Amino acid sequence: TTDRLDDLAAVPPADYLKIDVQGAELAIISNAKAKLAEAVLIQAEVRFLPLYDGEPGFGDLDRELRAQGFLFHDFAFLKRQALQTPSSARLRRRAFRQAVDGDAFFVRDLTNVGDMTDAQLWRLAVLAQAVVGSPNLALFALDALAARKAVPADAADGYLALLPPAMLREA
C-alpha cells in the first residue's frame, strides 16, 4: 500500500518539493495539500507524450497545482524529439520540436503575492536564485519584501550587484 504524504507525520511541511517518480507526480501532489500549503516552489517531472499507460500529462498536473495555488513558471529542461515520418531522419536534432518531457517549475501564485508571508517571500527569493536560476523571480520577491519594509529599500540593488554583468542591461 501507499501512504498519503499528508498522513506521514515524520515528513515536515515543505518550502520546496522536487519530485520525479515515473508518472506518479499527480497522485503524490494531490495527496500532499497540507504538506505543500506553505510551499513556494515545486519542481516536477512533466510529460507531454505518455510513456506509461494512464500517465497524467502536463495539463493534469498543472490543473492540480493551480488548484493548490501554484502557477507554471519555467522549465528546468525540456526534452524534444522528432515526429517519426519517412522524412524526419533527414532533420538535425535542433529541428525536433515535439516536446516529450522535462522538469517544470511551479511557483506560488504571484498574482496573489499579498497572501504570501514575508518568510515565504524570503524563501522564494533564495530558491529563485539557487534552484531556478531566475534573477527576475528573485527580484520580484525582493521588491515585494521591500514594499513591505521587510528588507532595506536597496536590497534589490545589492542583489543586482552580485549578478554577472552579462545579465544586466547597460545603464
Task: Give residue spans per PLM region.
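Short, charge-rich amphipathic alpha-helical segments embedded
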Residues: 135, 139-170
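Conserved acidic-Pro-Pro-aromatic motif
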Residues: 8, 12-141, 145-146
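S-adenosyl-L-methionine
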Residues: 1-5
